[in-house]
């Protein structure tokens, strides 16, 4: 389960699980607690990547706070101070909430006042929407000298926006993303990013689910995995 879910198809899924011979479910979309409570009555559950903090449901995720701190410290050490965050919706996604928190905390610890105008929310994470939002940011009186994006898709959008508005990357503006997906090495310049251990998360989620199916009395577990900073051309010159 990893697509955007409406209330209607949530009920469809609950009914489907109730009426089918399903042994367990790995959830990759943040679900409301009441929905998780309904699902866990019907089948073993493991949350993977996105999660809601529920005492009796396991999850595997990454350390979004530390990953953000890692990227911000790298950019700050490169001498950039006016760092913008292009994020998904913190009210909707746990990872976006944690990355916003890490962004604000790291800047404050560096003695830099967070500029609300440098926090851009792109709720759908869409490339075209992000290009428009970042272009608007670059047209302001105080454009950033670095842009940290919550995904590589939005970082690619930042590269496009910089090109449209006449900014050089990385000379004028550093650009960094998150995820280390294929697009990060398909752009010019290549995108500095945070590598998520996607294989490990998937493997651990399935292993945890299988152990819960084998032993229904097994207590829930939480695994928070580390990430890796991948430095590429969009910040390195």
Give the ranges of each region predicted by the language model.
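Central regulatory/effector-binding core of bacterial HTH transcription factors
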Residues: 1-33
């Amino acid at each position: 389960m990893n697509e955007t879910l409406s209330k209607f198809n949530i009920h469809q899924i609950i009914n489907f699980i109730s009426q089918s011979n399903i042994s367990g479910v790995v959830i990759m979309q943040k679900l409301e607690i009441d929905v998780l409570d309904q699902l866990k009555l019907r089948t073993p559950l493991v949350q993977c990547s996105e999660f809601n903090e529920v005492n009796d449901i396991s999850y595997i995720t990454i350390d979004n706070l530390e990953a953000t701190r890692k990227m911000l410290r790298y950019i700050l050490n490169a001498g950039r101070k006016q760092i913008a965050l292009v994020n998904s919706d913190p009210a909707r996604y746990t990872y976006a909430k944690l990355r916003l928190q890490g962004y604000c905390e790291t800047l404050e610890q560096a003695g830099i006042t967070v500029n609300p105008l440098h926090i851009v929310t792109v709720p759908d994470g869409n490339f075209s929407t992000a290009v428009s939002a970042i272009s608007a940011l670059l047209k302001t009186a105080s454009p950033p000298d670095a842009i940290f994006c919550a995904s590589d898709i939005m970082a690619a959008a930042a590269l496009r926006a910089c090109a449209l508005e006449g900014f050089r990357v990385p000379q004028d503006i550093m650009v960094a993303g998150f995820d280390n997906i294929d697009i990060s090495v398909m752009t010019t310049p290549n995108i500095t990013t945070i590598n998520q251990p996607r294989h490990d998360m998937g493997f651990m989620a399935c292993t945890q689910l299988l152990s819960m199916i084998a032993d229904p009395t097994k207590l829930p577990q939480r695994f928070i995995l580390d990430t890796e900073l991948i430095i590429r051309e969009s910040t390195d010159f």
